[in-house]
């Protein structure tokens, strides 16, 4: 599983950087795992140069048996009886008059649990769009009601590939509602907005990175299989959000180094964290093209002959919508280690006051996969 988590994290960091280049100060929220899974399903049907580009950009070329590894990861993540709700769901919607290869359909079903729903894009594209949106709405508990806006599919559409991820988890240590106060959140050196600032003082895995002047805090969810990890600069020192230094240094190796469990220690932390909701929508086509996935979106060059045997398919858009709601109880998100016990008197007390922009991610600890990744820079 380690190869896959390394590949997925590598891609997550690259995509975050690409989104940051397009919008250096706004909020970001994505599910890298959801996007990787969707592209892995497409990868099953790509051939030639198209396959090579997808494989390189998503680091699939570093993973043996990529599809069976995704299959195990999906099983691991969607496992019943967990103290949180986490669902990763895949589906294909194909034009009913179009012939998809039986091999391709069998593989997507086996590896990704994605069945093919036949729809009438040709005669009734609007009905097909509504059907797809209804399915996504159901998979995300109503949090993503309209993945595809009007006009996004038409009578030329042959295939829509949908991946939805939904997460709802309660904190291992909840914030007391009565401790939440209105407080200023600094967007940059001069502007502030008011937020509902939550507070608690408990023992959490924590670290301070000297050369970055940055605090790292891990907030585990019930059961401790999932955690939210937050990177918070000491202060806003640049002319932007205060995150420039971290974002410039953000690589797979650095992110792992900063946040791996063995580099954190248990501390008594005064945590101030804003309550927030983010809903983001992306057409990832241009961002993926920047990472080297180009032929896939080009009508003349795309080779998806592993899906149909013909060369007439291409991907017109990759749409990603995500939702996160973080509050005192825990986190609701859609996009669809044993601590050492120390004597209380030896425990350092730390302050973690997230009253200015920070980067956060939700990690599946057993597999070290990043389920969600974001930047909170403005309420």
Swiss-Prot record:
The superkingdom listed in its UniProt entry is Eukaryota
As stated in the Swiss-Prot or TrEMBL entry, residues carrying the post-translational modification N6-acetyllysine are 137, 177
Q: One MF term from GO for this chain?
A: serine-type endopeptidase inhibitor activity
Q: List the GO terms this entry assigns under cellular component, sorted alphabetically.
A: cytolytic granule; early endosome; extracellular space
Which InterPro entries does its entry note? Serpin_CS, Serpin_dom, Serpin_fam, Serpin_sf, Serpin_sf_1, Serpin_sf_2
Keyword Nucleotidyltransferase present in the record's keywords: the answer is no
Does the entry feature the keyword Ribonucleoprotein, yes or no?
no
Q: Which GO terms describe its biological process?
A: negative regulation of interleukin-1 beta production
Q: Where is this region: CARD-binding motif (CBM)?
A: 351-379
- Reactive bond, annotated site positions: 344-345
At which residues is N-acetylmethionine found?
1
CDD domains in alphabetical order: serpinB1_LEI (cd19560)
Recount the PTM note: The N-terminus is blocked.
Protein family according to the UniProt entry: Belongs to the serpin family. Ov-serpin subfamily.
* Name used for this protein in its record: Leukocyte elastase inhibitor
State the organism of origin: Equus caballus
Name the encoding gene, please.
Answer: SERPINB1
